[in-house]
Amino acid sequence: MEVERIALKYALINAIEHGGKANPKAVIGKVLGENPELRSKAREIVPIINKVVEEVNSLSLDEQKAKLMEIYPEYFEKKEEKKEEKKGLPPLPKAEKGKVVTRFAPNPDGAFHLGNARAAILSYEYAKMYGGKFILRFDDTDPKVKRPEPIFYEMIIEDLEWLGIKPDEIVYASDRLELYYKYAEELIKMGKAYVCTCKPEKFRELRDKGIPCPHRDEPVEVQLERWRKMLNGEYKEGEAVVRIKTDLNHPNPAVRDWPALRIVDNPNHPRAGNKYRVWPLYNFASAIDDHELGVTHIFRGQEHAENETRQRYIYEYFGWEYPVTVHHGRLSIEGVILSKSKTRKGIEEGKYLGWDDPRLGTIRALRRRGILPEAIKELIIEVGLKKSDATVSWDNLAAINRKLVDPIANRYFFVADPVPMEVEGAPEFIAKIPLHPDHPERGTRELRFTPGKPIYVSKDDLDLLKPGSFVRLKDLFNVEIVEVGEKIKAKFHSFEYEIARKNKWRMIHWVPEGRPCEVIIPEGDELIVRKGLLEKDANVKAGEIVQFERFGFVRIDKIEGEKVVAIYAHK
C-alpha cells in the first residue's frame, strides 16, 4: 500500500535521527505535509501511520538503518554528500597569528563542570587556532570562603587532559603573593589605593551614599604604615583592607572603591600554609596576572562582566592595555545540577556518591556516564560565543554523542528483569551475531540455543507476548507463544527472517545463560538500577562504551567477579 510505503520511509528516517524512536506526530506531519492530496483522508491514514511507527520502533537502530538502506538508499547518499560542514569558531577580534595568549582560571575548590568547560575549551581552541599560548592559572587565593583543596588541583588537570586540553604553562596564584604585594604598594605610593580600617557596615553605608571613607585621602605615609601593619600582623582579620580608588559616583555601588587585599588569620592554605596572612581578592590578583602573563584575550561569562569594569582601573593607573574580553552566556544542561556549592552539600549529606555521580554535570560525571570529550567540545563550539544563556537538553548532548559512539560501540544483548522462555520443537542452533553490523572485521559473538534449556527474555517485552502471537528471537528463529506466566512457553515456527518480516512479527532479543549485570540509570535526581543478564561471553572491559541492543548505549563502570555494572548514557 502506497501510504504504508511512504510512512515507513519517514518513520525510519525519524527513528534513525532520534536514537531509534520515531515520533508518530512528526511522521504524520511529514507524510501529510509532503503529500497534501492525502489530507482529505487523514482520518483513515493516521491509524495506518501509527501502526507503521510502532513496528519501526520495535526494531533496533541497526535494523532500522538496514531497512532504510533497502528501501531508500538515497538518504545515506545525500547525507554523505553534504556531510555536515563542521561548525568552526568565528574569528577572534584583534588576534594576530602567533601572538594570542589565553588563560583559564578555575578555583580548585571543587571539580569543574560543563559550564566551566565552555571558557576552558574556547580559550584553548582559540590559542590553538592562532598558534598562540594557553595558560592554566589556578585562582587559589581565597583560603576562607572558597577554600582550595589539593585533590581538586589534580582533578582539574586530569579533566582538562581528558578534554584534550594541554596547557602550555600552569600558574598558581597562591605562589605569587609577593608579586601582588609589590603592585599593591606601588598603587598606594601612587595615591591610587589606600588602607581602610572602617567597619564593613560603616564603609557600605558611606559607599552607598557616594561619600569617601575617612581613610581615603590620608597621606601616603600613613597608608604605607597601615599597609606594613597589615603585613606584620598588627591588624587582625576584618580590621583592615586595601581598596582601589574608583569613581564614588559609579552607578554600581560594588565598583566604588572595591577591595583588593584583605587579612585572613590562620589561612592554612594547601600550598602556602600559614606563611602569608594578606591575601588578594580575585579582581586584583587576576588583573595583575593577566598583565604579567601577557594575556591578550579573556573569555568570561556574561555574569562576570563587571569584573572588567573594576580591573580597568588598575590598567589605567599603570598605563597598561587591557586584554580583549569576549563575554559569553552561561551554559547549563536541563535538569542537571552544575552548582559547586549544591554538589558539595549533596556529597556531604550522602545524597550524591561523589563528584563523578552520574546525575551531576561535572566533567567527571559526564565521562563516567559515557559522554565522549569530542561531544562536549562539539556542543560548546556549536553554542559558540553567544552572549545569551544557553540551556541544552540532555537529548541535545546525547544526539551529538550518539553519532560519535555509534561507530565504535560493540553490540551485545542485555536482558533486563529476565523471564525464562521454553521453546518446544527447536533444534540446537548457534547464532553468530556481528559485534558491529558496520564492521565485520571485528568478528562475531556466539549465542547457543540448546533444546530442553530455557532462554531468557526481558519482562519489558511481555506486552508483545500473548498466547497465539508470533515473535522473532533476534538472530535466532521465529516462535509462536503458547503460554505466558512465570515462565513463557513457546514452540518453534521457522528460521527465516523473511517470514517474520512479511508477517510484521515483532522482534525481541534474548540470552541463553548469562552473566549478572546491573545498569544504573540516572533519572533526574534518582538512580534507577535495572538488574538482568548480559551475554555470558561478552568481552567487555571497565571504561568501555558499548550498545545493549534495544536498550541503549552504556559505559561499563566496573566488573566485580562475574557481575558487570554499567551506567546508562542514552538511547
Swiss-Prot record:
Question: Source organism's superkingdom?
Answer: Archaea
Where located? Cytoplasm
**Has keyword Ligase?**
yes
The record's gene field reads gltX
Top enzyme class, one word, equals ligase
Q: What does this protein do?
A: Catalyzes the attachment of glutamate to tRNA(Glu) in a two-step reaction: glutamate is first activated by ATP to form Glu-AMP and then transferred to the acceptor end of tRNA(Glu).
Q: Report the family membership.
A: Belongs to the class-I aminoacyl-tRNA synthetase family. Glutamate--tRNA ligase type 2 subfamily.
- Pfam families tied to this protein: tRNA-synt_1c (PF00749), tRNA-synt_1c_C (PF03950), tRNA-synt_1c_C2 (PF20974)
Matches recorded under InterPro entries: Gln/Glu-tRNA_Ligase, Glu-tRNA-synth_arc/euk, Glu/Gln-tRNA-synth, Glu/Gln-tRNA-synth_Ib_cat-dom, Glu/Gln-tRNA-synth_Ib_codon-bd, Rbsml_bL25/Gln-tRNA_synth_N, Ribosomal_bL25/Gln-tRNA_synth, Rossmann-like_a/b/a_fold
What keywords sit in the KW lines? Aminoacyl-tRNA synthetase, ATP-binding, Cytoplasm, Ligase, Nucleotide-binding, Protein biosynthesis
Enzyme Commission designation: 6.1.1.17
GO BP annotations of the record are: amide biosynthetic process; glutamyl-tRNA aminoacylation
Q: What is its main location?
A: cytoplasm
Q: Which reaction does it catalyse?
A: tRNA(Glu) + L-glutamate + ATP = L-glutamyl-tRNA(Glu) + AMP + diphosphate
By what name is this protein known?
A: Glutamate--tRNA ligase
Q: Which Gene Ontology cellular component terms are annotated?
A: cytosol
Motif 'HIGH' region boundaries: 106-116
Which HAMAP family does the entry link to? Glu_tRNA_synth_type2
Gene3D superfamilies attached to this UniProt entry: 2.40.240.100, HUPs, Ribosomal Protein L25, Chain P
Could you tell me one molecular function GO term of this UniProt entry? ATP binding
